[in-house]
């Protein structure tokens, strides 16, 4: 009997106390008007300061994702030199859950200058959990009309550590995008193809 109790306790400790990957209530959380996040990566650390008024719904979602550790252990899976460094989730379950609740489209209030920060998207109503840092002055992204939506609203900027961002491995450039689904479903196989990609070890709020 005692052996059974110990087994049950072990199961509870192993699974019952594991962190949740998603709760629909999290998508209702509101970000502070201004906040800063720190990225600890395989190349070093950098900070991004966010301003909610520039894209309120985007800021809320990013705040939610950071608060609930969505980006921890994820990859900078697309680094196009002089253009963008893009990242997102790496857990197939969490990725699917978060992406089931899209972020409403918003107008561009701040341009995509070097060091600014925006959500990636593939058209109208597709902002979810993938973002990019501008590695150059990408003003065309302010007005680009694609799949019924115009522009990529930036809502933050790298305030320290831009030299770290610029050192992220960029040798694969956009070629990784052809294997994006593999990254989500089988990270190990994805990394066999692209072993030099840099990792986001963790992201957290610093104020």
Give the ranges of each region predicted by the language model:
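Bacterial Sec-dependent N-terminal signal peptides
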Residues: 1-23
């Amino acid at each position: 009997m005692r052996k059974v109790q110990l087994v049950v306790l072990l199961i509870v400790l192993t699974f019952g106390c594991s962190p949740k990957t998603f709760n629909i209530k999290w998508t209702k959380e509101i970000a502070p008007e201004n906040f800063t996040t720190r990225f600890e990566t395989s190349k070093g650390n950098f900070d991004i300061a966010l301003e909610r008024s520039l894209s309120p719904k985007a800021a809320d979602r990013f705040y939610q994702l950071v608060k609930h550790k969505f980006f921890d252990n994820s990859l900078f899976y697309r680094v196009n030199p002089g253009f963008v460094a893009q990242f997102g989730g790496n857990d197939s379950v969490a990725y699917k859950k978060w992406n089931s609740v899209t972020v409403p489209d918003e107008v561009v209030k701040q341009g995509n200058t070097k060091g600014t920060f925006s959500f990636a998207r593939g058209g109208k109503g597709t902002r979810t959990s993938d973002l990019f840092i501008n590695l150059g002055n990408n003003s065309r992204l302010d007005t680009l009309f694609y799949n019924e939506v115009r522009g990529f609203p930036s809502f933050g900027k790298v305030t320290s550590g831009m030299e770290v961002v610029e050192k992220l491995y960029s040798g694969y450039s956009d070629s990784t995008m052809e294997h994006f689904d593999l990254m989500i479903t089988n990270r190990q196989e994805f990394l066999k193809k692209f072993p030099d990609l840099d990792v986001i070890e963790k992201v957290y709020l610093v104020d």
